[in-house]
Amino acid sequence: MGDAATLALGALTAVQTGCAIDLDTDHTGPNAPSVGPLRTTPRVAWVLGSGGPRGFVHVGVLKALSELGLKPDLIVGASVGALVGTLFAGGLRANEIERLALELQPALLLRWQPGSSERFSGAGIASFVNQQLDGQRLQALPIAMVCVVQRLRDGVVQGFNQGDTGLAVQAAAAIEGQFTPVRIRGERFADADLRMPLPVRLARSLGATRVLAVDTSAHEERRPAGADRYATSDTRKRALTRPDAELADVLLHPEFGYWASVSTEYRQRVIAAGYAATMAQAAALKALHAT
């Protein structure tokens, strides 16, 4: 099922609420997602990368960071990193997010409603996020949040930080070829994974001087026999990730195995890997957040 499986939290709501699918609505109202100034200049930013089912690792990272008593000024998230990061920025505790992640029944994925070209609508993701956060707008979340998207017309990467929170996450998680792009003010937006899967440079451009980045890409050196067909994809992802990874002050690249899955066992293992990798860097992380 690939990257689409990572967005199962939103799919769960789509199934439960029976939300309608509107494949090409142009969102033009005053609450449509947009780019605007942050409330304050951030010092510490957490950057949560894209990564398909491996993105469950973010849940474990946030759980560990919470136990360490650490908090960012800004969270910048790509794809599943936008989904998990937004829930946390909106006030959900890490253990609540973990519960949601583990309660997912993968069979529900089979009930997603297909759109054009055998793609799925991400409308359930928007509904889910807005329900969980009581309709808070992005600019009003307790922690400043940026949902990273690419504008399909020209591939420009930008970060929504104002407007409809759920719709911004839907756009950030609209995996090309699998989910219908989100149309906002005449432009089509989608997941930025093919442009900037670990948006550290974007966090820096917003003023962050200290950056923790969570890389969820595969460990190429541990590619097992039989996985050669994924070599090109792995190399592409590594090439896109490297320029940003090198700019992070603390980089977490948890060891979660090569093969990805949406099984409960896999989710538990990946969350645990994120937690362990974070705790292993506790001293460096505390120093990063020190005044």
Where are these regions (language model features)?
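Patatin-like phospholipase
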Residues: 3-75, 87-291
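Gly/Ala-rich beta-loop-alpha elbow adjacent to hydrolase catalytic centers
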Residues: 77, 81
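Catalytic DNA-binding helix-loop module of base-excision-repair DNA glycosylases/AP lyases
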Residues: 84
